[in-house]
């Protein structure tokens, strides 16, 4: 179909569509790749680290994958804290912290796969059996947890302290520093705020965002709710199951 001036509308639309499709395909691939990264760092690495510690250090071989995941998060946070404190006080770069943290956790996970491969297979089989034999009440609870997680993940929620904590994470990523820039003013801090130095969760958000190649704000408002809400329920379930 042509306009009065001879412009071919149909052919032009085809050309536009052909130009857009590669871009859309690339974006879908990037989203899929980032989802895999999130699964690795939010689930795979904690599980493998916790499994290695429980089986080889604590010699507890009768516990399920949930115990390994929770233990792994304790270990990940401990490793992160021990790495962050000296680097922060030494005014090291965020990139160095990311490299060291990823190296320690990655190496530990690889060792876990090598030494605990039989236990991993057992956990896969026992997990399948557990979910297969779970009651209706259990699946209703899972559905409610998914709904709660989905609301906070998909819809917008505003936290008053985001002006500092998320801004601190974003500033760390953008300036490649560890709590050296005031997120309110953008000026270099003359002294460390010890309250936040001793509890560097905004720095963890920045490191995690680097590892999964996402903006810290998206990590804080979309990724972390999807991770930590189910994790909190998992901790509660493991505690209650002991009684």
Where do the language-model regions lie?
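Membrane-embedded, hydrophobic transmembrane alpha-helices
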Residues: 2, 10-128
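Active-site lumenal/periplasmic loops and adjacent helix-entry segments of GT-C-fold
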Residues: 144-243
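Internal/C-terminal transmembrane anchor helices
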Residues: 130-151
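Short, flexible segments with low predicted structural confidence
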Residues: 24-25, 57-58, 136-141, 211-213
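A short, ordered amphipathic alpha-helix with a cationic face
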Residues: 73-75, 141, 194-195
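Residue-level detector of alpha-helix boundary/anchor positions
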Residues: 2-4, 152
């Amino acid at each position: 179909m042509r306009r009065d001036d001879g412009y071919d509308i149909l052919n032009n639309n085809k050309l536009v569509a052909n130009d857009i499709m590669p871009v859309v395909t690339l974006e879908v691939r990037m989203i899929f790749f980032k989802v895999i990264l999130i699964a690795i760092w939010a689930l795979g690495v904690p599980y493998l680290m916790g499994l290695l510690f429980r089986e080889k250090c604590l010699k507890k071989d009768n516990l399920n994958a949930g115990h390994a995941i929770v233990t792994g998060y304790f270990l990940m946070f401990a490793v992160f804290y021990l790495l962050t404190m000296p680097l922060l006080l030494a005014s090291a770069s965020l990139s160095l912290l990311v490299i060291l943290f990823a190296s320690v956790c990655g190496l530990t996970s690889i060792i876990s796969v090598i030494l605990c491969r039989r236990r991993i297979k057992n956990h896969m089989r026992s997990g399948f059996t557990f979910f297969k034999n779970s009651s209706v009440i259990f699946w209703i609870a899972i559905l409610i947890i998914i709904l709660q997680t989905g609301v906070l993940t998909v819809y917008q929620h505003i936290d008053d302290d985001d002006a500092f904590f998320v801004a601190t994470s974003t500033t760390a990523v953008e300036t490649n520093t560890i709590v050296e820039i005031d997120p309110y003013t953008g000026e270099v801090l003359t002294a460390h705020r010890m309250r936040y130095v001793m509890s560097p969760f905004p720095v963890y958000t920045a490191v995690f965002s680097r590892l999964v190649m996402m903006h810290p704000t998206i990590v804080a408002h979309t990724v972390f709710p999807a991770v930590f809400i189910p994790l909190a329920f998992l901790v509660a379930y493991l505690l209650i199951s002991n009684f």
